[in-house]
C-alpha cells in the first residue's frame, strides 16, 4: 500500500526540480535505476531475458 502511494506521489511533478528522483517505471524501486531505460536492474534483467529490450543480449566471453 505504501509503495502505491509513493508511486502516485512520484508521478506528479514536484514543487522544486531537485526533489525529483528516478524510480523504476515497472515496480517503483528507487535504487539501481538505469536512466537510459527507466527501469531498475531487476526489471531490466527480466525484460532483457524475455527479449523485450531491442539490441540487448546477455554477455558471454
From Swiss-Prot:
InterPro entries, A to Z: Ribosomal_uS14, Ribosomal_uS14_bact, Ribosomal_uS14_sf
Any one of the GO CC terms: small ribosomal subunit
Alphabetical keyword list: Metal-binding, Ribonucleoprotein, Ribosomal protein, RNA-binding, rRNA-binding, Zinc
GO BP annotations listed: translation
Free-text remark on how the cofactor is bound: Binds 1 zinc ion per subunit.
A single GO molecular function term of this UniProt record: rRNA binding
Binding site for Zn(2+): 24, 27, 40, 43
Needed co-factor(s): Zn(2+)
Function, as annotated: Binds 16S rRNA, required for the assembly of 30S particles and may also be responsible for determining the conformation of the 16S rRNA at the A site.
Family affiliation: Belongs to the universal ribosomal protein uS14 family. Zinc-binding uS14 subfamily.
Quaternary organization: Part of the 30S ribosomal subunit. Contacts proteins S3 and S10.
Protein name per Swiss-Prot or TrEMBL: Small ribosomal subunit protein uS14
Name of the coding gene: rpsZ
Amino acid at each position: 500500500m505504501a509503495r502505491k502511494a509513493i508511486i502516485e506521489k512520484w508521478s506528479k511533478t514536484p514543487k522544486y526540480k531537485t526533489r525529483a528522483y528516478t524510480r523504476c517505471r515497472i515496480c517503483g524501486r528507487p535504487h539501481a535505476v538505469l536512466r537510459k531505460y527507466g527501469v531498475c536492474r531487476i526489471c531490466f534483467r527480466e525484460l532483457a531475458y524475455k527479449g523485450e529490450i531491442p539490441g540487448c543480449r546477455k554477455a558471454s566471453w
